[in-house]
Amino acid sequence: GGPVEQVTTGERRLSSFSFSADGTVMAFTATDPVTPTELYVAMGDGATEQKATGFNDDWLGLVTLQPAERLTWTVEDGTEIEGWVIKPVGYGEGDSYPLILKIHGGPHSAYGNTFFPTFHVLSSAGFFVLYTNPRGSSGYGHDFMYATRGQWGILDKEDYLTGVDSALARYPAADSTRLGVSGGSYGGFMTNWLTATTDRFQAAVTSRSITNWESWYGTSDAQGLTEYEFMGTPWEQRDLYRRLSPISYVENVTAPTLIIHSEEDYRTPLG
């Protein structure tokens, strides 16, 4: 019944907590942008924390991982957006590197202080990696999470493009003429939306994506999502469903795009 007090420390993601019967010892998993998930044990007050597993120690001794650097920017209405940049392995001030924007799904989810293997694969291949939590993401309050209701692809597009500009300004070695974009599920929708409504990106990878919200509604298992977010069904909000569908602007796409899908993905199915 007392006040809540944080007893763990560090910029990382903790989960899967388990406590001893008397509450004096706890175990949990933890990860951060350069540390894959491991198991930790500590006293109930957070003291004497020790890493109990070393599943990834050998692998970490073989690879070079760049840290994630936090970046924030302000969009037109004054909202602050949070993101992170991972530099390319072997980064040098005088060199030039492509930049990839990675987009999370949801849209009501979020990136954070977590290990993302894909991002490090891209970094090791010589890419800057930008990932961010635009409006619509979770973790920043109700108004932020539902700011994009009825405007999917509109407000978050501004957040992403402003973030790309901010990253290019902060990292002169990032080449504005070699930009890529990639995401899955809602991130795939957003990838499609960006390549259909802007010419900023020279290449794209869209995974488990949505191009047509009307056909998605007829095949997905999550119709309630757009019934709320688009304020009705496709036959009640036909213009909105079509206006927010990337397929409506497909003739504008010029970026070479790799399309990846999953036959048994019932949330974002084929078709």
Model regions and ranges:
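Active-site-proximal cap/loop segments of hydrolase catalytic domains
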Residues: 124, 131-271
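Peripheral, non-catalytic segments that deliver or gate enzyme domains
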Residues: 1-82, 86-95, 107-125, 166-169
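Structural cue for short, hydrophobic secondary-structure segments
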Residues: 102-105, 121, 131
